[in-house]
Amino acid sequence: MMLLSSSYSGGQFPGVSPLGTRPKRSTTVVPRPVVTRATAGGVRNNLEVVGNAGTLQGMDIDELRVIVRKQLQGVELSPSSYDTAWVAMVPVQGSRQSPCFPQCVEWILQNQQEDGSWGHSAGPSGEVNKDILLSTLACVLALNIWNVGQDHIRRGLSFIGRNFSVAIDGQCAAPVGFNITFSGMLRLAIGMGLKFPVMETDIDSIFRLREVEFERDAGGTASARKAFMAYVSEGLGREQDWDHVMAYQRKNGSLFNSPSTTAASAIHSCNDRALDYLVSLTSKLGGPVPAIYPDKVYSQLCMVDTLEKMGISSDFACDIRDILDMTYSCWMQDEEEIMLDMATCAKAFRLLRMHGYDVSSEGMARFAERSSFDDSIHAYLNDTKPLLELYKSSQVHFLEEDFILENIGSWSAKLLKQQLSFNKISKSLMPEVEYALKYPFYATVEVLEHKGNIERFNVNGFQRLKSGYCGSGADKEILALAVNKFHYAQSVYQQELRYLESWVAEFRLDELKFARVIPLQSLLSAVVPLFPCELSDARIAWSQNAILTAVVDDLFDGGGSMEEMLNLVALFDKWDDHGEIGFCSSNVEIMFNAVYNTTKRIGAKAALVQKRCVIDHIAEQWQVMVRAMLTEAEWAAGKHIPATMGEYMSVAEPSFALGPIVPVSAYLLGEELPEEAVRSPEYGRLLGLASAVGRLLNDVMTYEKEMGTGKLNSVVLLQPLAAGGAASRGGGGAPAPAPASVEAARAEVRRAIQASWRDLHGLVFGSGGGSSSSIIPRPCREVFWHTGKVASVFYQEGDGYARKAMRSMANAVILEPLHLQE
C-alpha cells in the first residue's frame, strides 16, 4: 500500500534584484500570528512577523497583496550610483566639454548622503562597505570631470579617506571586479589631481591588489578570463583592447547589459550603438540608471519563483500567468534578454514547463556542454547561482532520451558537488544547493520547503555585481503574507487532525489491533499534494481513505484469515446490498462499515461539487483494490511467481491503493469531472503511472524486508535466475541471488521508475496533458503528479510509516510553529 511501505533565487550575471527599491514606510506593528523567533537567549514567542522584516502598521492582507502585486507587475529597478556615475562621465559626441547625460550628473548632486557617500548599505545597520566606497569614488570622478559640485567632491573624498581601510580589508565582501574597478578609478582620480586623505602605503596596497587580480588563477578557461576583463573594462581604461571588447556587444548596443561597461565603451571607443543604448536607457528611466538593463524578464521571473517558494503564488495567479505569457512570447522570439543569459534562460525554461507551456529543450542547447559554463564569467567567478538554475532546469524533461537536458544535469551536478566539496558556495546558498542535489524535484515536500524558505528569508537582500543594489521593495510584505498564510494553514491542518482522531474513534478503527492507524502521517500524505488551505474537504477525504486503505492492506498482508479476506471482497462487491452477505468477524464489520459510511459522507460532498452522484465510481475503486490484494494473498499462499512484469504490475498497481484515495479527492478540488473524463484513457493513464511510480518505489526500498517474509515484488521478479533455476522468494529454501543480480534488478526497476516519472510529467505538464484538448482539468491532473511526489517522499529510505523521519516531517508541517530569524 502506498503510504505504508531563500528566498529569492538569483543567479543572473550580470543581474539585478528582481524587486527594486524599497519605498519608505512606517515601522509599527500589525496584529501578527504567533511564531517562534530565535534570539541569543533562546526561543521565545512573539506576535510580530520577524525582527529583520521590520513591521507594517495598519495593513491588512489585501493591502499587502496590493503592494506585492504592484511590484510584480512592474518590477522597480534599484538605482545604481556607480553605473549612474559612469553614464554621467560620457561626453557629448565630438566634444569633451559637456556631459551627454546631464540628468545623471544632476541626480548625483541630489543624492549624496549626509556622510558624503553615495550607494547602498548592505544591511539594516548601515555599515560602510566596498560598494559604497566604489560608488562614492565613481560619483566624485563624474563631478570632477565636469567641474561641478566642489563641496560634494570634498565631502566624498573625506568619506573615502575615513573609510579607506575597508577597501583593503580582504574580509569585507566586495563587488565583482572591485580590485580592478576601484584601483582603475583611483589611478584616474590621482591623474586628475584629486587628493585623498590617506597614507601613500594604503594607496600602494590597492595597486598591489590590482596586480594580484591580474595574476590570479581564477576558475574557467582563457575565454572566461577575457569575458570577465571585458565586463570590468571601465577599470582598465586605455589599457583595454576596446576592439576586442566590442565583440561582446549585444543587439541593443550594450555590453553585457551593463550601463557602466557600455558607458566606458562610449567614452573610449565612441561607439554609436553603445551611445544609442545609453540614450534609450536614460530616456526611459530619467536620472539614475540600474546596475543592469534590460532586466525585466529575469527580475519578474525571480519574483515569481520567490512567491512560489514562499507558498503564496496562488494569491497572484493572474499576474503570474501574464508574466509567463510574456516570457513565453520572448522565448519563442529567441530574444537576447532570455536566451543569452544562463540563469534567465534556465529559470524561464523551468517555470514555463512547470506551468504547462510547450517549450522545447532546443532552447537550452547552447548550455548542453560544460564548456558553456567554463568559458563564461560565471566560471571565472565560481558563480553558483546560474549553475544551480541549470541543474534545476535539467530535471523538467518529458522524453526518455532528451540528451540536452541529460547533459546539462550531468555536468552541472558534478560542478555543484565540486563547489560544495571545496567550500566555494556561500553560506546563504549552501542549503538550497544541498537540498537540490539530495532531493529531485519530484521528491520534495512543497509545504515543508515553504516553511524553510520563510524561516531563512532575508528581507534585507543585497546583491552584488560591480555595484550593489537593494532587494525587493516588497520583501517585507512577501514575508508577512507568507507567515500569515503558513500560520493559518497550520491552524487548519491541526483542526483536520483533531477531526481525524475523532473519526477514528467514531468508527472504532483503533480497536483493530493488527492495523496501523496513524492519523498524523496520513494527514501529511494529504498535505503534500493538497496543501492549499481551501482544499480541506479533499485533504480530509484523502487522509481518511489513506487510513482505510492501510487498514485493509494490513488485513490482506497477514492481519486476517483467508475467510475474512473473501468476506470483505464479497461485501465490497455487493456494496449497498452488503446485508445479504453478513460479517464473518468483528474486524471485517468494523472495516467495511468505516469504508461504506465514510464513502457515503464523502460522496455527498462530492455530489455538490460534481452535480452528480459519484458513489458508484468510488465503490468501483474499492472493489478493484481489494480484488488485487486478494490476488496477491493467493499468490503468496500458493507461492506463485508471475511469468512477466506485465502480469505482476496488473495486480501490483491497483493493490498500491491509490484508486480509493486520489480519484476520490479529485472530486473535491472544485473542478467538475464529468463521467467521460474519469472513464477516459487519459485518466486511467494518469492513475496507472502514479500507481506504477509508487509501487516500484516501494519495491526498491522494501525489497529486503519483503524478501525475508516471502512476499513478491518487482526486484525479486527481475533478478536473473540464480543457481537452481529459480529466483529466491526468501524463506522458501531457494538459493539467495548473487549481490550483482540484486543490484541489476534494482537498477532496472529504477529505470522503470524514471520512465514512469517522465511519462507522468509529460502527461500533466507537457503537450500531452498541458494542451487545451485535455478533458481533465489541470488541477486534477496535477494531483496525480503530486501523488507520485508523496510516494517519493515516503519511500526515500524505506517503509513510509515506519520511518521516524516521517513523523518528524509531519510534526514540522502540521504541529511545530515557524522558527524565524531575528
Swiss-Prot record:
Q: How is the cofactor bound?
A: Binds 3 Mg(2+) ions per subunit.
Which SUPFAM superfamilies does this entry report, sorted A to Z? Terpenoid cyclases/Protein prenyltransferases (SSF48239), Terpenoid synthases (SSF48576)
* EC number from the UniProt entry: 4.2.3.33
Write out the residues that bind Mg(2+) 3: 698, 702, 706
Q: What class of enzyme is it?
A: lyase
Induction behaviour = By chitin oligosaccharide elicitor and UV irradiation.
Q: Which Pfam families match?
A: Terpene_synth, Terpene_synth_C
Gene Ontology molecular functions: magnesium ion binding; stemar-13-ene synthase activity; terpene synthase activity
Q: Which coenzyme or cofactor does it need?
A: Mg(2+)
**Reaction catalysed?**
9alpha-copalyl diphosphate = stemar-13-ene + diphosphate
**Similarity comment:** Belongs to the terpene synthase family.
Q: Domain notes, please?
A: The Asp-Asp-Xaa-Xaa-Asp/Glu (DDXXD/E) motif is important for the catalytic activity, presumably through binding to Mg(2+).
Q: What does this protein do?
A: Catalyzes the conversion of syn-copalyl diphosphate to the phytoalexin precursor stemarene.
Identification of the protein by name: Stemar-13-ene synthase
Write down the species.
Oryza sativa subsp. japonica (Rice)
Gene name as annotated: KSL8
